Amino acid sequence: MIELDLPLDPGDLFHLCLSVGDVEVAKARLGATRAWVWAPVEDWTLDVFLPGGDVAPMEASVTYSVHGPLHVELTQFRAGPLPAGDDLVEPHHLGYWSADVEATTRSLIARGWSLEYQVGAVGGQPIAAMVRSPAGYRAELVPTTSRPRVEAWLARG
């Protein structure tokens, strides 16, 4: 049996991602039961760096619920190493702020986690990293330097 290992600070948790087949359909489905307010949908094309050195393009449409403190992220993966979602049932990952994505990733790997991919790099730091726990859940590490951009995006909702 794999022990539950929660080395990330719950205070750094800021979103729950649902992988969806269509962002607009998912927004409508969620809006039918609650008064959700969404940030504008952004279309992203990013280079994803896989373990072993391979690079793959990833295309996604992304939005966040505006109201927190825990935001819901809807992501439609259109191309890349991640499968497209088709429902709102299973979370794709939990998103955490990280002061040092690279160091946090190394620390988690030392605890038995695995790196699924990293996204880009700014000044030597990854823009984000997706890691998987020994128990099987994913966590996305997002640098705290991205927080002002994300908060400005949410304010446009």
Regions found by a protein language model. Name each.
Residues 71-76, 92, 102-105:
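A generic structured-segment signal
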Residues 1-9, 73, 85, 110-157:
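Vicinal oxygen chelate
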Residues 2, 46-51, 80-83, 150:
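A short, acidic/glycine-rich surface segment
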Residues 61-88:
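Helix-adjacent hinge/juxtasegments
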Residues 8-10, 19-68, 103-125, 155-157:
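Core segments of cupin and vicinal oxygen chelate
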Residues 14-23, 87-102, 136-140:
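Short coil/turn motifs at helix boundaries and re-entrant loops, enriched in small/polar
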